[in-house]
């Protein structure tokens, strides 16, 4: 499928691994001029090199923590006028015990998963509306719609992000700019592996990956019957970044193998 974005400038914030990397690969394959950010320099540089060689694409790595003002400024300087903005920001460490959550932990969660994406969008939206074309996609989490105690530090702030984008998306749609959210469920990523310890804490389990995974699959039925890979999300992310998605506005698209049962 031709996404009709060849030559466009695209940012993938958090593009060195996991769902961000998989999405970046799809964008590079589509022929965009790609900018990817991440905090870890070595993995970021390797990702940029591999994608550039594989797809013959221009891939610029930007070492930056998008949850900080300094990190965002580095991004803004490196790519001042993108056509496409995709964002995934690693959330705070999971915590399965609500009694252990402190005000400082809440502030960190909000700064990372709410203020960070909002400030990036707020910076780039005026240019997109002026140019009468733009695509913005937030890769968040299905716990924004489906609360889970062991995802307590991720879900609430992301729910606020969904509320924000629902309003803003309708303000900018008339200018040819679309804004949507993807809400992934359980994917095999580094973040999933790191969540097993708080998951064990929340349910009184041995902190062992096999034990926790067996418990999760038994108690959180995924109709599809498996945990997803990042490549299971990337095609939808790329579609939302494309010319083909011009009539998709303000949507929260759940990609979870059917785990979250809802008609909306």
What are the language-model segments listed below?
Residues 173, 178, 248-250:
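Short, small/polar-rich loop/turn modules that mediate ligand/substrate recognition or access, typified
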Residues 137-160, 165-174, 185-188, 220:
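Catalytic loop of short-chain dehydrogenase/reductase
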Residues 121-122, 166:
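A short, exposed helix-loop element centered on a Lys and neighboring polar residues
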Residues 4, 146, 226, 238, ...:
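Short C-terminal tail/terminal secondary-structure segment
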Residues 9, 16-17:
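Conserved glycine-rich cofactor-binding loop
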Residues 83, 99-118, 137, 154, ...:
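Catalytic Tyr-X3-Lys loop
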Residues 126, 170-171, 246:
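Alpha-helical segment proximal to the catalytic Tyr-Lys
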Residues 72, 90, 96-98, 102-110, ...:
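Substrate-binding pocket helix/loop in short-chain dehydrogenase/reductase
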